[in-house]
Protein backbone atom coordinates (compact mmCIF):
# COMPACT_ATOMS: atom_id res chain seq x y z
CA UNK A 1 0.00 0.00 0.00
CA UNK A 2 2.83 2.39 0.78
CA UNK A 3 2.07 5.32 3.06
CA UNK A 4 -1.10 5.74 5.11
CA UNK A 5 -2.29 8.76 7.10
CA UNK A 6 -4.72 7.88 9.91
CA UNK A 7 -6.74 10.29 12.02
CA UNK A 8 -8.72 8.37 14.63
CA UNK A 9 -10.86 9.09 17.67
CA UNK A 10 -10.99 6.80 20.72
CA UNK A 11 -7.97 4.78 19.58
CA UNK A 12 -7.68 1.60 21.61
CA UNK A 13 -11.25 1.56 22.95
CA UNK A 14 -12.47 -1.37 20.82
CA UNK A 15 -9.35 -3.42 21.53
CA UNK A 16 -9.54 -2.68 25.28
CA UNK A 17 -6.04 -1.20 25.22
CA UNK A 18 -4.64 -0.23 28.61
CA UNK A 19 -3.95 3.30 27.36
CA UNK A 20 -6.74 4.70 25.21
CA UNK A 21 -6.36 7.92 23.30
CA UNK A 22 -9.05 10.52 22.68
CA UNK A 23 -7.52 11.35 19.32
CA UNK A 24 -4.54 10.28 17.24
CA UNK A 25 -3.02 11.59 14.01
CA UNK A 26 -0.52 9.09 12.62
CA UNK A 27 1.63 8.86 9.50
CA UNK A 28 2.52 5.26 8.62
CA UNK A 29 5.14 4.28 6.06
CA UNK A 30 5.69 1.05 4.17
CA UNK A 31 2.33 -0.43 5.12
CA UNK A 32 1.84 -3.97 3.83
CA UNK A 33 -1.41 -5.93 3.93
CA UNK A 34 -2.41 -9.13 2.16
CA UNK A 35 -5.95 -9.43 3.50
CA UNK A 36 -7.50 -6.01 3.00
CA UNK A 37 -6.31 -4.56 6.32
CA UNK A 38 -7.43 -7.39 8.61
CA UNK A 39 -3.72 -7.63 9.36
CA UNK A 40 -0.84 -5.42 8.32
CA UNK A 41 2.77 -4.64 8.97
CA UNK A 42 4.05 -1.10 9.29
CA UNK A 43 7.73 -0.29 8.92
CA UNK A 44 7.43 3.07 10.68
CA UNK A 45 4.68 5.10 12.32
CA UNK A 46 4.76 8.43 14.08
CA UNK A 47 2.37 11.15 15.05
CA UNK A 48 0.56 12.93 17.82
CA UNK A 49 -2.23 11.96 20.17
CA UNK A 50 -4.31 13.24 23.05
CA UNK A 51 -4.65 11.46 26.40
CA UNK A 52 -7.48 13.01 28.40
CA UNK A 53 -7.29 13.66 32.12
CA UNK A 54 -10.04 11.13 32.91
CA UNK A 55 -7.94 8.31 31.42
CA UNK A 56 -4.72 9.70 32.89
CA UNK A 57 -6.39 9.81 36.32
CA UNK A 58 -7.45 6.19 35.89
CA UNK A 59 -3.89 5.17 35.00
CA UNK A 60 -2.48 7.15 37.93
CA UNK A 61 -5.06 5.99 40.45
CA UNK A 62 -5.52 9.62 41.48
CA UNK A 63 -7.60 12.54 40.15
CA UNK A 64 -5.34 14.62 37.89
CA UNK A 65 -6.35 17.83 36.11
CA UNK A 66 -4.63 20.66 34.31
CA UNK A 67 -3.42 23.36 36.69
CA UNK A 68 -1.84 26.25 34.81
CA UNK A 69 1.40 27.12 33.04
CA UNK A 70 1.97 23.52 31.92
CA UNK A 71 1.49 22.08 35.40
CA UNK A 72 -0.76 19.17 36.35
CA UNK A 73 -2.76 19.27 39.57
CA UNK A 74 -3.76 16.59 42.07
CA UNK A 75 -6.22 17.46 44.83
CA UNK A 76 -6.50 14.93 47.64
CA UNK A 77 -7.70 14.73 51.22
CA UNK A 78 -5.22 13.90 53.95
CA UNK A 79 -5.28 13.84 57.75
CA UNK A 80 -3.07 16.22 59.71
CA UNK A 81 -3.20 16.14 63.52
CA UNK A 82 -6.48 14.24 63.39
CA UNK A 83 -8.20 16.70 61.05
CA UNK A 84 -9.01 16.07 57.41
CA UNK A 85 -7.49 18.75 55.18
CA UNK A 86 -7.17 19.27 51.46
CA UNK A 87 -3.75 18.91 49.84
CA UNK A 88 -3.21 20.52 46.44
CA UNK A 89 -0.21 19.18 44.55
CA UNK A 90 0.98 20.71 41.27
CA UNK A 91 3.91 19.58 39.19
CA UNK A 92 5.42 19.31 35.76
CA UNK A 93 4.83 16.05 33.92
CA UNK A 94 8.09 14.35 32.96
CA UNK A 95 8.41 11.43 30.57
CA UNK A 96 10.88 8.62 31.09
CA UNK A 97 10.90 7.43 27.46
CA UNK A 98 12.99 4.34 28.22
CA UNK A 99 10.65 3.12 30.97
CA UNK A 100 7.51 4.56 29.29
CA UNK A 101 6.40 6.23 32.51
CA UNK A 102 5.34 9.72 33.53
CA UNK A 103 6.03 11.37 36.86
CA UNK A 104 5.42 14.76 38.42
CA UNK A 105 8.51 16.84 39.06
CA UNK A 106 9.11 20.26 40.56
CA UNK A 107 6.19 19.57 42.89
CA UNK A 108 4.53 22.34 44.83
CA UNK A 109 2.22 21.23 47.63
CA UNK A 110 -0.17 23.29 49.72
CA UNK A 111 -1.93 21.67 52.69
CA UNK A 112 -4.84 23.66 54.09
CA UNK A 113 -3.55 26.64 52.10
CA UNK A 114 0.00 26.45 53.49
CA UNK A 115 2.84 25.83 51.01
CA UNK A 116 5.18 23.04 52.09
CA UNK A 117 8.97 23.26 51.68
CA UNK A 118 10.33 21.59 48.52
CA UNK A 119 11.89 18.62 50.36
CA UNK A 120 8.63 17.87 52.18
CA UNK A 121 6.66 18.32 48.96
CA UNK A 122 8.84 15.80 47.09
CA UNK A 123 8.56 13.25 49.91
CA UNK A 124 4.77 13.60 50.10
CA UNK A 125 4.47 13.37 46.32
CA UNK A 126 6.51 10.15 46.28
CA UNK A 127 4.14 8.67 48.86
CA UNK A 128 0.96 9.75 47.04
CA UNK A 129 1.74 9.24 43.35
CA UNK A 130 3.77 6.47 41.76
CA UNK A 131 5.15 6.72 38.20
CA UNK A 132 2.31 6.42 35.69
CA UNK A 133 2.90 3.65 33.15
CA UNK A 134 2.22 4.38 29.49
CA UNK A 135 2.85 0.78 28.43
CA UNK A 136 -0.09 -0.46 26.41
CA UNK A 137 -0.49 2.42 23.97
CA UNK A 138 -2.47 1.10 20.97
CA UNK A 139 -0.68 -0.42 17.96
CA UNK A 140 2.50 -0.99 19.96
CA UNK A 141 3.46 2.68 19.75
CA UNK A 142 5.64 4.37 22.36
CA UNK A 143 5.64 7.91 23.74
CA UNK A 144 8.55 10.21 22.89
CA UNK A 145 7.28 13.50 24.31
CA UNK A 146 4.43 14.72 26.52
CA UNK A 147 2.93 18.19 26.79
CA UNK A 148 0.14 18.94 29.28
CA UNK A 149 -2.61 21.30 28.11
CA UNK A 150 -6.14 22.17 29.17
CA UNK A 151 -7.72 19.52 26.92
CA UNK A 152 -5.39 16.71 28.04
CA UNK A 153 -1.83 15.53 27.66
CA UNK A 154 -0.53 15.74 24.10
CA UNK A 155 1.66 12.70 23.44
CA UNK A 156 4.09 12.33 20.53
CA UNK A 157 4.21 8.70 19.39
CA UNK A 158 6.57 6.52 17.39
CA UNK A 159 6.80 2.87 16.42
CA UNK A 160 8.87 0.67 14.13
CA UNK A 161 8.20 -2.75 12.62
CA UNK A 162 4.65 -2.97 13.93
CA UNK A 163 2.44 -5.99 13.29
CA UNK A 164 -1.26 -5.17 13.50
CA UNK A 165 -3.95 -7.79 13.41
CA UNK A 166 -6.55 -9.86 15.15
Where are these regions (language model features)?
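N-terminal beta-strand/beta-hairpin edge segment
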Residues: 1-55, 62, 67, 71-79
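Short, cysteine-centered beta-strand-loop-beta hairpins and adjacent loop/turn segments enriched
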Residues: 11-18, 79-85, 112-114, 162-166
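Extracytoplasmic/luminal low-complexity segments enriched in Pro/Gly and acidic/polar residues
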Residues: 114-166
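A mature extracytoplasmic/lumenal domain signature
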Residues: 10-12, 30, 78, 91, ...
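Amphipathic hydrophobic-ligand
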Residues: 1-5, 18-25, 83-90, 138-145
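Short, well-ordered strand-loop elements centered on a beta-strand within folded domains, enriched
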Residues: 39-40, 44, 97-109, 154-158
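A structural signal for short hydrophobic beta-strand segments in well-ordered beta-sheet cores
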Residues: 64-65, 91-95, 146
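Short helix-loop boundary/capping segments
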Residues: 71-120
Amino acid sequence: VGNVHVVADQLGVTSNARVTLVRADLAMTDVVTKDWFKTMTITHAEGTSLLDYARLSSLAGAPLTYGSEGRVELVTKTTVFGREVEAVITGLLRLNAKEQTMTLSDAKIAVAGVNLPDFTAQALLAALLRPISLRGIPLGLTATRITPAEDGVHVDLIGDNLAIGP
